[in-house]
Amino acid sequence: MKLFCCLAIISLIPKPVKLMGQNSVYIDAQNDFLNYKGAGTDKYFTAGISLGGMFHLNKNESTYLSIALNQKMYTSSNIILDSEELSPLDYPYAGLTYLSIGYLVFNKKNTAYTKAVVSLGTTGPSSGAKMIQRKLHRIIGDREPKGWSTQLELGNFVQTQIEHTRSYLNKHWVKINMTSSIELGSIFNNITLAPEFKLDKNKDPFIGFYNKRISTNKKPHLSIWAKPKFQLIIANCLLQTNQNSSGCFPRTINKFIYQSSVGISLQIKNLSISLIQHNNTPEFKTATPHAFGEIAMQLNL
């Protein structure tokens, strides 16, 4: 778990309609310190890190296996408050550490793909989130988070997700896709619809993330994209668990959440680097909007 560190990178930029199958590795970091407004917030979903790889499985180059080690951290809206000062209506402290295994299938025309992911992990002190955030804050000279003694302990968990993305417009510079997904599991249960808009002279229509394939480009290649996401929340055990006492839930979750994501990606030969900004509407009634950034890198092997 000591390998988790707040560093960078998410990847991108697919290429021609016929892509060489390849193996790749990536590192992806998310943090609200990377807020586009210029000031870190350290609240709600405050940091995440993923280290993983993707490997093509057969000669037709249409199926891929992905595997990643991930960690996510959540804190209250004010990390300098002591445990006894925290409001039950604020976001709870929580850490998730988990292993994800995915299976990705493209159709022959490269106009659609389907992805299935299973994640197995743990929460609470065994996630290592408290230790890692405190050490990172000491290294960068930031405030020490004081509320980790109240972190949620939900035990081990399992999450499953199925996602389907289809291209509806692929004309020269402009690409438009639609993504639908459902996530079910011990903690998060939701349904998502998200159109994708991409400006890119490349023939590949999709937004290329670190868990997507990319093809090697001889010349530097730039891609700009936007992804508004609409989410129906069925359940969120992070917000619907009262860590202080039993009884009714202290927070009223919002059933509909909106997230806007905007990214820019640069690919140089077999290396892809991406910078992304996310903005979320409040997840529960007493919450406020939240912004965080993401930086990632993928390398073809």
Locate each region found by the language model.
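Bacterial Sec-dependent N-terminal signal peptides
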Residues: 1-24, 301
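N-terminal ordered "arm"
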Residues: 22-60, 64
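Transmembrane beta-strands of outer-membrane beta-barrel proteins
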Residues: 23-27, 63-69, 114-120, 160, ...
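Histidine/cysteine-enriched polar flanking segments
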Residues: 35, 39-48, 71, 93, ...
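Outer membrane beta-barrel transmembrane domains
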Residues: 35, 77-82, 202-301
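Short glycine/proline-enriched turns and hinge-like loops at secondary-structure junctions
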Residues: 42-43, 112, 174, 287-290
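Hydrophobic, lipid-facing positions within transmembrane beta-strands of outer-membrane proteins
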Residues: 47-53, 95-99, 116, 156-162, ...
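Outer-membrane pore/translocation modules
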Residues: 71-213, 234-252, 279
